[in-house]
Amino acid sequence: MRVSANLKSVRLSAQKCRLVADLVRGKSVDQALNILAFSPKKGAVIIKKVLESAIANAEHNEGADIDTLRVTSIFVDKGASLKRFTARAKGRGNRIEKQTCHISLTVGN
């Protein structure tokens, strides 16, 4: 049994989010929640919400036992970039890109 949860267009770069995703891949759900609760990174808060959603999906839709669930797969893909300008000297402007990412998490036995 595999249950997934997805989150699209998160305002965080995929590179920074993958650092947190690597911490919880393959861990049990309880252990993953503890790791995410004590991680100081912004991505930890976001991934924790996705993990809690996947746990709720497994419990509600499949009637799964939470104690046996593991994070079977988690991957972070690059999303669309928000193009913005920042002011520079002499009336010029430089383009900056605000990165987004898509998080896909799967829990199972």
Swiss-Prot record:
SUPFAM superfamilies: Ribosomal protein L22. InterPro entries: Ribosomal_uL22, Ribosomal_uL22_bac/chlpt-type, Ribosomal_uL22_bac/org-type, Ribosomal_uL22_CS, Ribosomal_uL22_sf. The keyword Ribonucleoprotein applies. It comes from the Bacteria. GO terms for cellular component: cytosolic large ribosomal subunit. GO terms for biological process: translation. Pfam families: Ribosomal_L22. GO terms for molecular function: rRNA binding; structural constituent of ribosome. Belongs to the universal ribosomal protein uL22 family. Part of the 50S ribosomal subunit. This protein binds specifically to 23S rRNA; its binding is stimulated by other ribosomal proteins, e.g. L4, L17, and L20. It is important during the early stages of 50S assembly. It makes multiple contacts with different domains of the 23S rRNA in the assembled 50S subunit and ribosome. The globular domain of the protein is located near the polypeptide exit tunnel on the outside of the subunit, while an extended beta-hairpin is found that lines the wall of the exit tunnel in the center of the 70S ribosome. This is Large ribosomal subunit protein uL22. It comes from Chromobacterium violaceum (strain ATCC 12472 / DSM 30191 / JCM 1249 / CCUG 213 / NBRC 12614 / NCIMB 9131 / NCTC 9757 / MK). The gene is rplV.
